[in-house]
């Protein structure tokens, strides 16, 4: 398996100013080890030695996740500074409510991922993506992203959208195209903590309305054409889809207390803390599917999701069904 970058997701904090109803980043307020710089250094030094069987990579990327990691700006800066000094590529996932907080050090970040499920205020309130009744609007997000790009012209922008019972009818693809993002990841809500996921109908309805790669602007049309010509599975796609099966046991994740953890079961499975054992030993204590990991960064899973959607709506049985049309009941905003 040849991949350029291995990505490790460190959920450094559980604290968040939103209360998303489907959130899986719950650890019942465990001790967060990033409050101690020595622990942060131990974790990062441990991660530097990561090796995966039959997997070659040239770069390690630390993806800082929460909770909402941006809320504790100074502490976040200390982690980023330390990771940068150890030659990690650095990315971050945020709900976007305080993107301005990372402006002083965004030049050290290669990718900012923003979790956006809707641009409709009422929908976001129903989901729990609000703080004291305030939600982020499309125009606010656009302006914040433009400011970050001004400070770091090479910054990649990714949007993560979780398809759930409140937003499955919305058409977001045109707004995403207007933002000129580098990647749009569409994820299916995971069953977790006694909460059910969403039905095949709802997930496939969202895909039918939004899985339209042709609408997304490309940074480099020529390289995209050449990649598509030589290897269709590696073309420069912007939209990536992750169904529940693709999302399970395919991420390398660290909990706030420093343990590797893995999904795919009714409860998380954990390793011993990375402050106590090596990363190799920790990987032996959890299930991690390297093939799934690799496939998430290609578009195999996306093509499969598209095929399943077409099959679900019996589109392959009728030649006159056009995948390019939009359902009439989408978001009007």
UniProtKB/Swiss-Prot annotation:
Residue ranges constituting the Radical SAM core domain according to the UniProt record: 1-239
Binding site for [4Fe-4S] cluster: 16, 20, 23
Transmembrane residue ranges: none
Catalyzed reaction equations: GTP + AH2 + S-adenosyl-L-methionine = 3'-deoxy-3',4'-didehydro-GTP + 5'-deoxyadenosine + L-methionine + A + H2O + H(+)
Gene Ontology molecular function: 4 iron, 4 sulfur cluster binding; lyase activity; metal ion binding
Top-rank taxon: Bacteria
Pfam families recorded: Fer4_12 (PF13353), Radical_SAM (PF04055)
Cofactor or coenzyme needed: [4Fe-4S] cluster
Enzyme class: lyase
UniProt-listed PANTHER family: RADICAL S-ADENOSYL METHIONINE DOMAIN-CONTAINING PROTEIN 2, S-ADENOSYLMETHIONINE-DEPENDENT NUCLEOTIDE DEHYDRATASE RSAD2
Protein's name in the database: S-adenosylmethionine-dependent nucleotide dehydratase
Species of the source: Fibrobacter sp. (strain UWH6)
Gene behind this protein: vip56
């Amino acid at each position: 398996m040849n991949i350029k970058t291995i990505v490790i997701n460190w959920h450094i904090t559980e604290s968040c100013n939103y209360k998303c109803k489907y959130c899986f980043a719950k650890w019942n307020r465990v001790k967060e080890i990033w409050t101690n710089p020595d622990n942060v250094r131990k974790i990062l030094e441990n991660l530097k030695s990561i090796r995966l069987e039959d997997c070659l990579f040239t770069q390690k990327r630390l993806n800082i996740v929460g909770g909402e990691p941006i809320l504790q700006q100074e502490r976040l800066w200390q982690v980023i500074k330390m990771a940068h000094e150890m030659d990690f590529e650095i990315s971050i996932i945020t709900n976007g409510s305080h993107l301005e907080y990372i402006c002083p050090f965004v030049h050290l970040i290669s990718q900012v991922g923003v979790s956006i499920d809707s641009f409709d205020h009422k929908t976001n309130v129903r989901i729990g993506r609000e703080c004291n009744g305030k939600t982020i609007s499309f125009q606010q997000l656009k302006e914040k992203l433009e400011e970050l790009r001004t400070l770091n012209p090479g910054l990649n922008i990714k949007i993560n959208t979780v398809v759930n019972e409140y937003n499955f009818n919305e058409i977001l693809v045109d707004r995403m195209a207007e933002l000129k993002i580098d990647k749009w990841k569409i994820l299916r809500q995971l069953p977790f903590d006694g909460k059910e996921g969403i039905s095949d109908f709802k997930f496939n309805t969202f895909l039918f309305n939004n899985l339209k790669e042709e609408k997304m602007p490309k940074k480099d049309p020529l390289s995209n054409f050449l990649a598509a010509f030589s290897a269709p599975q590696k073309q420069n796609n912007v939209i990536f889809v992750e169904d529940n099966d693709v999302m399970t046991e395919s991420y390398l994740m660290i909990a706030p207390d420093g343990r590797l953890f893995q999904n795919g079961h009714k409860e998380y499975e954990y390793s011993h803390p990375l402050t106590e054992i090596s990363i190799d030993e920790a990987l032996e204590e959890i299930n991690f599917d390297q093939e799934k990991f690799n496939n998430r960064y290609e578009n195999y899973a996306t093509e499969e999701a598209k095929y399943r959607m077409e099959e679900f709506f019996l589109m392959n049985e009728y030649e006159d069904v056009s995948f390019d049309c939009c359902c009439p009941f989408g978001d009007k905003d």
